[in-house]
Curated annotation (Swiss-Prot):
Induction: By the absence of external thiamine. This is Probable pyridoxal 5'-phosphate synthase subunit SNZ2. One of its GO terms (molecular function) is amine-lyase activity. Catalyzes the formation of pyridoxal 5'-phosphate from ribose 5-phosphate (RBP), glyceraldehyde 3-phosphate (G3P) and ammonia. The ammonia is provided by a SNO isoform. Can also use ribulose 5-phosphate and dihydroxyacetone phosphate as substrates, resulting from enzyme-catalyzed isomerization of RBP and G3P, respectively. It is an enzyme of class 4 (lyase). Keywords: Lyase, Pyridoxal phosphate, Schiff base. Its EC number is 4.3.3.6.
Length: 298
């Protein structure tokens, strides 16, 4: 079995689960108790990064290690786009997965990390099919929608998963000849075989999670019904008034996403949820609510 197959197999093991952002071992324990399939170790959640206006880098390895020691579920950590040395450090630390993330300040505005050079599986964000296939070609073992992290507004995540699905369907219908496939692969900057495999299967060849703006059980169920295979939850849980109850509810909603009666029960009495920031209040140049993080990446 190829090393890439091993890495994609590890990512498949998270399918149907919820991955939660945590900033302390105590939060990681809450996430594990609530049923999270993994945690993302961070010094600051995306909502706080967005407010700071500062350069956001890989978290302190000591903090990540403390979280790794506190829980038995897999631990992920983020690196800046293109910062392969941060990735080398996290691989040496033996994190379970690395997220090459647009939430952090990019280190390289031209190249993403060549992920085939690492044994640890990588997660990457994508807002359309071309981005997703370019990241997979670089070695990403899992794709997630970019959404708009730190907002509590799920609309961008919905847009991204919908676009990826629509493009797959459109290309399946319209690409008929070898020259059609070759032209589209050139346009997307991906190998033609990867494009053909994706269209033949009708889905990405790696697991595809939702991320960015998930704040409620209904948000999680919505994205699962739209075709996502699991959910990342960032700022939403620990910006709420009852994090453990909300965490449990989002895990349940991700499992029972097609059961309205169960979702009704899950969604009741959750306390005050994350206030959030509407996408319309954010512009690409930035401002008091930060810039559009989903536009970072190429």
């Amino acid at each position: 079995m190829s090393e890439f197959k091993v890495k994609t197999g590890l990512a498949q093991m998270l399918k149907g689960g919820v991955i939660m952002d945590v900033v302390t071992p105590e939060q990681a324990i809450i996430a594990e108790r609530a049923g999270a399939c993994a945690v993302m170790a961070l010094e600051r959640i995306p909502a706080d990064m967005r407010k700071s206006g500062q350069v956001c880098r890989m978290s302190d390895p000591r903090m990540i290690k403390e979280i790794m020691e506190a829980v038995s579920i897999p631990v992920m950590a983020k690196v800046r786009i293109g910062h392969f040395v941060e990735a080398q450090i996290l691989e040496e630390l033996q994190v379970d997965y690395i997220d090459e993330s647009e939430v952090l300040t990019p280190a390289d505005w031209t190249h993403h990390i060549e992920k085939h050079n690492f044994k640890v599986p990588f997660v990457c964000g994508a807002k359309d099919l071309g981005e997703a296939l370019r990241r997979i070609n670089e070695g990403a073992a899992m794709i997630r929608t970019k959404g708009e992290a730190g907002t509590g507004d799920v609309s961008e995540a919905v847009k991204h998963i919908t676009k990826i699905k629509a493009e797959i369907q459109q290309y399946k219908e319209n690409l008929k000849t070898e020259s059609d496939f070759a032209a589209k692969a050139t346009e997307l900057r991906v190998p033609v075989d990867l494009l053909k495999t994706t269209l033949s299967e009708g889905k990405l060849p790696v697991v595809n999670f939702a991320a960015g703006g998930v704040a409620t059980p209904a948000d999680a169920a919505l994205l699962m019904q739209l075709g996502c295979e699991g959910v990342f939850v960032g700022s939403g849980i620990f910006k709420s008034s009852d994090p453990e109850k909300l965490a449990c509810a989002i895990v349940e909603a991700t499992t029972h996403y097609d059961n309205p009666a169960k979702l009704l029960q899950i969604s009741s009495d959750l306390g005050d949820l994350m206030g959030g920031i509407s996408i319309q209040s954010i512009n690409e140049a930035g401002g008091k609510n930060g810039a559009r993080l989903s536009e970072i990446g190429w």
